[in-house]
């Protein structure tokens, strides 16, 4: 499998879907050969595994599994995320962060922060907030409702 278009960052959702469809149709997901579809007398479809002779014939024609990905692994990791890959059952609502470089890079960081609003990167206040200076507060309630002790003094550096 060549990844030239993926390296260039121009992989579209349609091309990724067609690639996955091709892998599934080729039976590569579970490292199995494709199944034949046969019709029974009542018109119902049934799947039949290929025989060893058919498997040898396909191997001689150049069919070889390229990738072996267990479907159970994909079921467990439905939301695997990396800068280049997002496996999900749902179509993405917006483009990946790598391609959101429409703004010029020279803009002022402060104005960008004001325009985008406040970002929370997993950092939330542990204690209840006060709008005035508090000097004698020794305990507080954290966001889970537990009573916590407030440190009066924090020493940093070598002690």
UniProtKB/Swiss-Prot annotation:
Seems to promote the survival of visceral and proprioceptive sensory neurons. It is found in: Secreted. SMART domains: NGF (SM00140). Disulfide bonds: none annotated. Belongs to the NGF-beta family. Residues 1-3 form the signal peptide. It comes from Candoia carinata. This is Neurotrophin-3.
